[in-house]
Amino acid sequence: MDVISELVKKNGSKILLIVLDGLGGLPVKEGKTELELAKTPNLDKLVKNSATGLHIPVDWGITPGSGPGHLGLFGYDPIKYQIGRGILEALGLGIDVKDTDIAVRGNYATVEYRNGKPIVVDRRAGRIPTEENKRITAKLQEAIKEIDGVQVIIKPGMEHRLAIVFRFPEKLSPGSDAINDTDPQQVGKEPLEPKGENPNAEKVAEVVRKFIQRATEILRNEPKANYILLRGFSQKPDIPTMEERFGVKPCCIAVYPMYKGLASLVGMDVIEFEGSTIQDEIDTLKKVWNEYDYFFVHIKKTDSYGEDGNYEGKVSVIEDFDAHLPQFLELKPDVLAITGDHSTPSILKGHSWHPVPLLIHSPYVLGGTSERFTERECLKGELGIIPAVKITQLLLANALRLKKYGA
């Protein structure tokens, strides 16, 4: 057990962590970042009585994926606990992943056959509607239920995405997921053949190759989604739950499968709800407020607009969140943290290595250091620049959930 686990105590306090995905940015207009351009009167008021700083999701100069970015926020070292995308996607779609499983994320894609070989012309099949995805996936699942004694579980995600789990009869050895992606990462190329990097992985890859062959036959006459590209083969990692480590009863309120999956992996209850807006998330939060003591709320669109290079869209999401902030505050959490899992500057159109703004509000902070919740103002804050993995213990401390260390 680590030191924090030994110091944890329960006291009924409530911790609310709100993650605006890809929150951090760089100057995009008039020398200002998206946070600086946004009109955020409610955040501006809150920040004056909060501890502020920035966090490094993984390590200096390292650009994190969403998985490592969130793991750090939850208090898990993302270098120690490495979780594959396939596992996250499968968990997020409600598949109860076991230690006999290899999970992989799939993209429906469009290929053209040239000289008998499939050539990728659209890696996302024109982002087919989710309903179309459900139809195609149901057809696939009906036709492919097992391969050589290995159960095949296929679940549709949003738009072109899906998850596939290969469930073997026995527990798999570590490293059985060491299989290359089949996505060539660009159009005009032939999909890659999945191959194992060791004998155990090659046994799995043999099943995967047969799956691709059968799926391709079934999809051949689909107008757009006539192929599947596979990414992120992964096994279930051995990871302690948040309740075991931190003594909290946690839940997750998120729209996108991967974030639900990650939360599930660390033992959070995933709260299902209709809709996808911030208001829908708040309504759900209110319903379960008395049932849990740690709440993770995920807001995706800041990241989506950042990746599109649409700084105005990102600004609008920040402003929309600010307009809803009073409803979060009405719940009176003992500790409120607002941050991102990583930075997604619009000018880079992708994740980046830059530190992420962090706000912690509780009765036990110095406060009075920042005028606004922005990158530059957070640099002035009492928290400084800290590793993301330390945030959870700060939240526990502010919730008075940690005993004194030593005599």
From Swiss-Prot:
Q: Which GO terms describe its biological process?
A: glycolytic process
The answer to keyword Membrane applying to this record is no
Tell me the keywords, alphabetical order.
Answer: Glycolysis, Isomerase
> What is this protein's function?
Catalyzes the interconversion of 2-phosphoglycerate and 3-phosphoglycerate.
List the residue ranges of the region (Disordered). 175-200
Instruction: Return the similarity comment.
Output: Belongs to the BPG-independent phosphoglycerate mutase family. A-PGAM subfamily.
Q: Which Pfam families match?
A: Metalloenzyme, PhosphMutase
SUPFAM superfamilies assigned: Alkaline phosphatase-like
Q: Which PANTHER family match?
A: COFACTOR-INDEPENDENT PHOSPHOGLYCERATE MUTASE, METALLOENZYME DOMAIN-CONTAINING PROTEIN
Q: In which pathway does it act?
A: Carbohydrate degradation; glycolysis; pyruvate from D-glyceraldehyde 3-phosphate: step 3/5
Q: What residue stretch is flagged as signal peptide?
A: none
Reading the lineage from the top rank, the first entry is Bacteria
Q: Name one GO molecular function term.
A: phosphoglycerate mutase activity
Query: Source gene?
Result: apgM
Q: What is its EC number?
A: 5.4.2.12
UniProt-recorded name of the protein: Probable 2,3-bisphosphoglycerate-independent phosphoglycerate mutase
Reaction(s) catalysed by this chain, per the record, are: (2R)-2-phosphoglycerate = (2R)-3-phosphoglycerate
